[in-house]
Amino acid sequence: MVSYDLSPEQDMVPYAHKDGDVWAPKRKNHIRKLNNAYWLSHSLFHSGAELVHGTVYDIPASVGLVDISTLGSILLHVRDPLSALEQAARITKETIIVTDILDNNRQKMVNRLAGWLGDAVVRRIRHKLLGPSVIFRPDAAVGHPEETWWHLTPELIERFLAVVGFGDSRISYHNQFFAQHNKSQLMYTIVATRTVPMKRAVL
C-alpha cells in the first residue's frame, strides 16, 4: 500500500494582488499539520503503508503498479485535474475511486428534489439538465479561494475516466460533516473499473 501525498508546494492560485511569499509559508505549515495527522493515524493503526510525496502530474515509476487508486477530494485542488487523473490511471490495474465535493447549487437542488427516486434516476436527471461540466472557482475580486480551482461534476469525471480506460463506473452520493464550517457537505463518489487493458509500455 502506498500513500501518495501532495508536496507542500502544491498548486496555489496565483492571485496577482497577493504576496505569495507571505501566505505560501502558512499553507506549507498547514500541509505539515496534515502530514502529522497522517503519521499519528499511521502509528495508532500500525499501518504498513508507505508515504511518498510528489506532484500528481508525474508519479514516479518507483511507486509501481497498484490494484486500486483512491483520490479523496484532491482534484478540485490541482490546476490540471485531468492530467492528475491520467497519471493515476497510468499506474492502476483495476479500479479508480474518486470522491469529491458536489458544491454547485444547481446540482445540490437536483439531488434534494429527486434524491428520493434513487441514484439511477438522479443521475439521468443530472445528465439531462447539467451534463459533464466544470466551473472555475477562483475569484480575483475577493482573492478567494486560494487552494480550490474547480468544481468538477461527477459526469465530467466519469467521462474522462472512460477516456483513460475505466469505462465501467457507478456514481453514489453522501453527506459528510465539514468541521471547519460546522455544516454537512454533499459529496459524490465514482467507482470506475478498468475496461481497456493497460499498455505494454506501462507494464
Predicted regions, residues:
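S-adenosyl-L-methionine-dependent methyltransferase catalytic module, highlighting the catalytic core
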Residues: 57-58, 70, 79-200
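Conserved SAM-binding loop
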Residues: 1-17, 21-107, 154-158, 192-194
